[in-house]
Amino acid sequence: MIIIGEKLNGSIPSVAKAIAEKDADLIRERARMQAEAGATYLDVCASVEEDVEVETLKWMIDLVQEVTDTPICVDSPSAKSCVAAIPFCKRPGLINSVSLEGDKIDTIFPVIADTDWECVALLCDNDGIPDSVERRMKIFFGIMEKAKQ
């Protein structure tokens, strides 16, 4: 089973406060605790304005890597921010996430192709998350087809 630690996310009020105040100790401690609890990956999501997102992701990723070798799961709604954060990671990890919604998949797949990076795939498209299994499977196969390209 793959376990992704999700407690380094700026949408969590205490983490948002730590990011705003540059409280490195809170970020390090959350990373250490999740790694010790057995997380396979540590999701890092800044949830800040796009103009400071990459530098904030770098700050957070650097702090996480000070206390653990657990691979990073780079998380942002912005494909450009995800791609920009990859070089900050000491080892391959995950991109969270790709789907058939928008063009994020077309930005991320070429960058992680032929690398050891992987991604979380969401079974949704521009119409949202389908109700039917058949439609979800169609999206799944669409994602897999893009991965082959």
PLM feature segments, named:
Residues 19-22, 26, 52-59, 131-139:
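Alpha-helix N-cap and loop-to-helix initiation/capping positions
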Residues 43-49, 70-78, 93-103:
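Catalytic beta/alpha-barrel core
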Residues 35-70:
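Glycine-rich, proline-tolerant flexible connector loops at the mouths of alpha/beta enzymes
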